[in-house]
Amino acid sequence: MKSHNAPITKVGVILRPSSPELKTTFLQIKEELNNAGIEVILESISGGMIELLGRDFHQLATQCDALFSLGGDGTLISMLRRAFEYELPCMGINTGRLGFLTALMPQNLHTFTSHLKSGDYTLQKHLVLQARIYSTLNTAYENNLDNKNQTPTQTLIAINEFLISKHELSGMVHIDASIDRKYFNTYRCDGLIIGTPAGSTAYNISAGGSVIYPYCRNILLTPIAPHSLTQRPLVLSDEFMLEFYAKERAKLIIDGQEMIDIMPSDRVQIQALPQSAMLMYPPTRDYFSVLKEKFKWGEEH
């Protein structure tokens, strides 16, 4: 969605953890934004890292018009999850390596500051997945599929993907999958990615999944090292509600950043949320040019 967006006059900034070397870059970015009439507030944990004052995340999210991350895609994804409930636009300034989701490099910010102040930027909506964990101890599988009133023990969101992975180093994980409460398949594999289009260029692509245009509303199912060659990646509409049982102890990994244990007595219910994560980009950004650059498509080898 281009132009006619709210002008940005105050931004909160979060830095990649354990990166005190970002202090110089942050101060340069702060100066550029201040010169454009945009106030900059640093998050308190980031501030402690570089010995500057900051405010806690809730203050940032409630007082600022937008949030900027300084780091790579991982820093941006972490910030998006934290900012999701506040419905704030977010932008990534890339100091990492690949940077599919980040908007620009620090040295290019000066070309974009006037656009921020006038509201001339692109605001893209990214699908977000929610996982609910239900304990089904001593209850039959079929009965629990119909138990709509059960309270989840945990509720989580993912920007890129949820990964159900084997708990031990050896062996496979066996995962029963249902779509809209109907048994669909048993995956025998090292792990199963339940991903978003934005995450299709992350772990999903390494596991043989398709690249999906990031602003589509799809859910990706991609098995990792499946036991059977017929277990292929699957792209679904966002309307489906998915449920998974791991038949042995397993791990649920969220965006590669958090991990929880799941037991054979746990049911993992995953579906797309109607609310989206909002990412800001310069109005000139072209996704296919980004793909071409990052994957080096069209180059002679």
Curated annotation (Swiss-Prot):
Alphabetic keyword roster: ATP-binding, Cytoplasm, Kinase, NAD, NADP, Nucleotide-binding, Transferase
One GO MF term attached to the UniProt entry: NAD binding
Organism in which the protein naturally occurs: Helicobacter hepaticus (strain ATCC 51449 / 3B1)
Record's catalysed reaction(s): NAD(+) + ATP = ADP + NADP(+) + H(+)
Reported function: Involved in the regulation of the intracellular balance of NAD and NADP, and is a key enzyme in the biosynthesis of NADP. Catalyzes specifically the phosphorylation on 2'-hydroxyl of the adenosine moiety of NAD to yield NADP.
Annotated positions binding NAD(+): 73-74, 160-161, 188, 190, 198, 201-206, 225, 257
Protein name: NAD kinase
HAMAP family xrefs: NAD_kinase
Documented EC number(s): 2.7.1.23
Cofactor: a divalent metal cation
Main location as per UniProt: cytoplasm
GO biological process: NAD metabolic process; NADP biosynthetic process
